[in-house]
Amino acid sequence: MKTFKRTLVLLVVCMLPVCMSARTEKETPAYRQKGYAGSVAMTDWLFVFGGLETSHGYMFNEHHYLGGGLGAHFCPIFFPDMIGVFEPFIEYKAYFLKRGSTPTASLRAGYCVASFFHPELDEGTVVYAEGISPFLCPAIGWDWGLKRGRGLSLNVGVQIMTNQMELLLAPKLSFGFCF
């Protein structure tokens, strides 16, 4: 009987690290494991321009993401000459907790490219890019892990741009799907 108890205790002690590591993997969603990660988000920029953004990159561990992407924000009808704003960017995102639900902070850097219609330049309508300006966009938010290695994110930030010697600040809200 003593041998059985000792064997059982030894087995439990040996299996404890395996059980603890399995539990940790369940707490961290699959989209935050080391390797490729991506997201697609609906955004509201300046509370006027609606759009989509996508970011693809590499998760170094469950806390650090580095990637790049493209945003496209479309103009409402009361900006008749403007088509939209396109933003190529690079992004760093920090996840503070190992849990599936965690606060986040991110920083994006890139260029805003505004596209306009100008019918008076040639015959027909001419589309060209104007107003290329660098930007930084710090944001805070929250990520929720879902089943099957997916997640949702909600972020609030401010886009800081420079355009012809002016500093422009624009609030930004995004709701995204992470994979």
Language model feature labels by segment:
Residues 161-165:
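Short, exposed beta-strand-loop hairpins at the edges of beta-sheets
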Residues 22-60, 64-70, 178:
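Short glycine/proline- and aromatic-enriched beta-strand/turn motifs that initiate or cap beta-hairpins
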Residues 47, 96-100, 179:
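A generic beta-sheet turn/junction motif
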Residues 92, 167-179:
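Outer-membrane beta-barrel "beta-signal"
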Residues 158-160, 172:
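Extracellular/luminal ectodomains and secreted, surface-exposed scaffolds of diverse proteins
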Residues 2-3, 20, 90, 105, ...:
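Short alpha-helical segments used as structural interaction elements across diverse proteins
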Residues 42, 55-152, 156:
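Gram-negative (and chloroplast) outer-membrane scaffold detector with strong preference
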Residues 1-32:
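Cleavable N-terminal export/targeting peptides
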